[in-house]
């Protein structure tokens, strides 16, 4: 079996080429060690075809095969699909509780601000002014103080309501913006899918890759990381190299919300109410709205696709969107609780006011103390009746009784023990023996207890979110470290590999030098 005179040179050259390519891969790893989404690469080495060729139809069986060197079969991404999914799931959960904890902390600061302008302080001062009036029922300054404290109480609650409405509006806008971000990411994934499919189609089965879509897959992986911070995404790998992405972990609908199907992406928007028919929220391309509602709603896409879509945000259980949606729910709940509180307070104070007698009057008062109104968002605002004067305050339960303070005491009792739904007039002696008059017929809570209860509920929810945040952050850090141990670039490891291939290159160059020397000797032997 004869071989080429330059056979050894070709083998040595293959080693030089391989070492250069491997060094280029290492250089690229080092250069991108801090690039977001970059996955460490490694040169996969493969023995070159031997000489003579392996037996086949067109190649005779010959013995004594010689190796023809080495080649780089492909540049491989070092990644783990399991660790990637685990980390993205944990990132989604972590971002949810981080966002929710921030929102609940902000609500707590608004509602339970520890200052002289807090809700509790304003409520205590209001009923404290009635206590002062009960000791001097004929005092005009004491009566004016009651009106002033009532105005302060209303202004304090209005300030809190305004801040909560601002937060409500901001969270709604944030969720809408984040959905638009999700839409943009979905479009990017669909575009990258198309490019990856195109490259994979260029590669013939069983042959070295014409081109590896490593960079595109890195970009797509980074987009998935960004999406997982916004929502709890699920994705599957398709045979052509593309991925399909959805929100939720369900395998059927309802159960998830499709975002990307190979090269097709779906657009999500928000709606304030359920649509009356499918055509009002779904187009033939599958664009769907995501409504904030507790009841699921599904239907069939127009255009004959037959695909059912659930538009309920309850399936968005992770990511910043879930944290903001739950924060919005909590804000709405606090506003509803404040509406109930202020409505009950206004009703009871007005009931006491109109069942008593104004200063020097022989008939019960017809002037309400409070005239509740609503904001543009239909939340209750507590305002003192502009027609109310100091003389109009009904501090007495009887007419023409000098120093009668029983109605003022009734108002004080309201602060600590509540009042019935039906207006009842009590005198001082009856109040002494009845210390548990409820706010309404359905509850025994006092106004003080009612407000404290709201704040306590908020505190419990905030503490739970903070606890979940700590747990989720710890799991996220752990999964991120595991993922980085596989996909991240270790500079020390790269430096060691660089020296290894440098030595290999030197050895190959030395081998070529020896072969060259042998050839020179042979040539010099020719006469």
What are these regions (language model features)?
Residues 1-527:
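Structural signature of extracellular appendage/secretion-system components
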């Amino acid at each position: 079996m004869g071989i080429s005179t330059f056979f050894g040179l070709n083998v040595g050259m293959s080693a030089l080429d391989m070492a250069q390519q491997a060094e280029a891969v290492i250089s690229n790893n080092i250069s991108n060690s801090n690039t977001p989404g970059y996955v460490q690469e490694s040169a996969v080495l493969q023995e070159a075809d031997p000489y003579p060729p392996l037996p086949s139809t067109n190649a005779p069986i010959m013995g004594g095969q010689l190796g023809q060197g080495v080649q780089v079969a492909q540049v491989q991404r070092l990644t783990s699909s399991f660790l990637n999914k685990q980390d993205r799931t944990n990132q989604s959960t972590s971002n949810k509780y981080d966002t929710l904890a921030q929102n609940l902390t902000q609500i707590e600061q608004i509602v339970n601000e520890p200052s002289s302008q807090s809700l509790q302080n304003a409520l205590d001062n209001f009923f404290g002014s009635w206590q002062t009036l009960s000791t001097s029922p004929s005092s005009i300054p004491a009566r004016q103080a009651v009106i002033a404290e009532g105005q302060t109480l209303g202004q304090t609650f209005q300030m809190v309501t305004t801040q909560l409405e601002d937060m409500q509006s901001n969270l709604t806008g944030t969720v809408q913006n984040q959905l638009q971000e999700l839409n943009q990411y979905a479009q990017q994934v669909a575009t990258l899918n198309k490019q990856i499919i195109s490259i994979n189609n260029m590669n013939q089965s069983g042959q070295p890759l014409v081109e590896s879509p490593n960079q595109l897959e890195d970009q797509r992986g980074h987009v998935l990381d960004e999406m997982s911070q916004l929502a709890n995404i699920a994705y599957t790998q398709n045979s052509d190299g593309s991925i399909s992405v959805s929100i939720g972990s369900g395998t059927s609908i309802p159960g998830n919300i499709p975002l990307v199907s190979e090269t097709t992406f779906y657009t999500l928007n928000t709606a304030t109410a359920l649509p009356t028919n499918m055509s009002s929220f779904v187009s033939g391309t599958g664009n769907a709205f995501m409504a904030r509602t507790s009841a699921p709603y599904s239907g069939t896409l127009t255009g004959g696709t037959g695909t059912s879509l659930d538009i309920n945000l309850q399936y968005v259980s992770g990511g910043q969107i879930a944290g903001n949606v739950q924060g919005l729910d909590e804000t709405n709940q606090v506003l509803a609780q404040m509406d109930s509180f202020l409505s009950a307070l206004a009703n009871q104070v007005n009931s006491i006011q109109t069942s008593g007698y104004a200063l020097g009057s022989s008939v019960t008062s017809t002037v309400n103390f409070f005239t509740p109104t609503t904001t543009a968002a239909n939340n209750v605002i507590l305002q003192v009746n502009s027609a109310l004067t100091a003389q109009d305050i009904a501090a007495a339960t009887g007419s023409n009784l000098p120093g009668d303070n029983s109605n003022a005491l009734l108002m004080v009792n309201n602060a600590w023990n509540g009042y019935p739904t039906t207006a009842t007039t009590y005198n001082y002696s009856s109040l002494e023996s009845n210390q548990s008059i409820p706010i309404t017929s359905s509850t025994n809570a006092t106004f003080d207890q009612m407000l404290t209860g709201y704040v306590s509920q908020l505190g419990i929810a905030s503490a739970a979110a903070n606890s979940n945040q700590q747990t989720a952050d710890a799991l996220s850090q752990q999964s991120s470290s595991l993922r980085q141990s596989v996909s991240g670039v270790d500079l020390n490891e790269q430096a060691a590999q660089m020296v290894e291939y440098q030595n290999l290159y030197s050895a190959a160059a030395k081998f070529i030098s020896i072969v060259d020397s042998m050839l020179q000797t042979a040539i010099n032997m020719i006469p």
